Amino acid sequence: MANKVEDLVNVILDSYKECDMTARIDEERMLNRDILIEIIDEIRKVLFPGFFDNNKVRSEYLKFLVGERLEFIQYHLKKQVSNAFANQDVCRECSKAQAEEKAEEVVFEFLKKIPKIREYLNTDIQAAYDGDPAAYSTDEIIFCYPG
């Protein structure tokens, strides 16, 4: 049985060489899908406090909570953007430090836009509610849109 498994391992390893588009061996990691999903979840919680949280959001802890979430988003998104830059033409000739610096700038510019994004969302939510006769509340719009 051990030889069969070893033979299979060798066949799979050969396939990594032959099908190199589907393997990234000894290369910097590109993007981490699981981390990106966590980042999106945290951004959604910042955009809609109290809607997608597991626990009640208390006003006395809101400043701490928002700060903690922004720190998480900034740290992890910076790493993901930096990895993307390192693997794209945007920053292919950059050093790792330059890619990280550029990523930090891009991420902070995005984070600075959160208040404006919230304004747009507020307007969009009201418009969706006004245009949907089946909607019972703006909360329903937030939970159900898009699809």
What are these regions (language model features)?
Residues 1-146:
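Terminal amphipathic alpha-helical/low-complexity segments used for targeting or macromolecular assembly
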